[in-house]
């Protein structure tokens, strides 16, 4: 496998048009499910990176029913101090992905997500590095940094000042989606001598689904197609079709 398929489902509200429905094949006029895509590519594992916890039960049940190994990760916003709820604190925001290795890892994810959604909430669920380290266990959790919106990306391209506490082993996803700044981020990661995993974020099935995906995002954010105001939305490469082409 040349690059890892990182799926996201419609449970990450407004971020994907793929569902977690248990069905044999995708058909016209109905939303595409992730599972027939896995079947097409003869994949026995699902790498699912979500922005919201609500889809875990369906993902876990359907993976078990279909004999698919679930690798479940949540994308978190991390800041310097979750107690600082002011505009300046937003300059330290960046994204990480935390994967659960086992049942105890799932329970730790619940704790992290609950804290971020309640005590840490400021415009969105947030946690900080101290809380993350307090709940962390290397036996149960795995840390990764997404290609987009990580501390590397934000410090390099958005003038933010993100200071991560890299207290545990971790790796970085590396992507190429034909965006103008992909090479800039890629060159920076390569210069850091870090553990890289080639990956492809997948939000829809085919390239010609991109207009439907963009429309869905506009509806979710109450914007318009003429002025969507979304980052990273000038490419139709975030799809399963592109992943298959890259993997032969």
For each feature predicted by the language model, list its residue ranges.
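Phosphodiester-processing cores and adjacent nucleic acid-binding clamps
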Residues: 1-248
């Amino acid at each position: 496998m040349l690059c890892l398929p990182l799926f996201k489902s419609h449970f990450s509200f407004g971020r994907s048009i793929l569902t977690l429905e248990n069905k044999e094949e995708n058909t016209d006029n109905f939303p595409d499910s992730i599972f027939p895509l896995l079947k097409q590519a003869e994949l026995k594992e699902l790498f699912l990176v979500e922005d919201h916890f609500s889809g875990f039960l369906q993902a876990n049940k359907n993976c078990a029913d279909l004999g698919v190994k679930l690798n479940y990760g949540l994308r978190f916003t991390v800041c310097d101090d979750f107690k600082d709820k002011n505009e300046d604190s937003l300059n330290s925001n960046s994204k990480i992905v935390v994967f659960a290795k086992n049942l105890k890892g799932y329970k730790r994810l619940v704790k992290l997500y609950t804290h971020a959604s309640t005590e840490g909430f400021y415009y969105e669920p947030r946690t900080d590095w101290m809380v993350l380290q307090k709940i962390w266990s290397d036996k149960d959790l795995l840390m990764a940094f997404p290609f987009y919106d990580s501390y590397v990306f934000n410090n390099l391209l958005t003038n933010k000042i993100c200071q991560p506490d890299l207290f545990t082993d971790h790796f970085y996803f590396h992507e190429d989606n034909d965006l103008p700044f992909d090479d800039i981020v890629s060159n920076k990661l390569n210069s850091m001598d870090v553990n890289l995993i080639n990956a492809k974020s997948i939000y829809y099935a085919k390239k010609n689904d991109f207009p439907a995906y963009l429309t869905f995002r506009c509806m979710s954010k109450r914007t318009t197609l003429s002025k969507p105001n979304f980052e990273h939305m000038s490419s139709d490469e975030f799809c399963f079709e592109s992943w298959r082409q890259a993997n032969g």
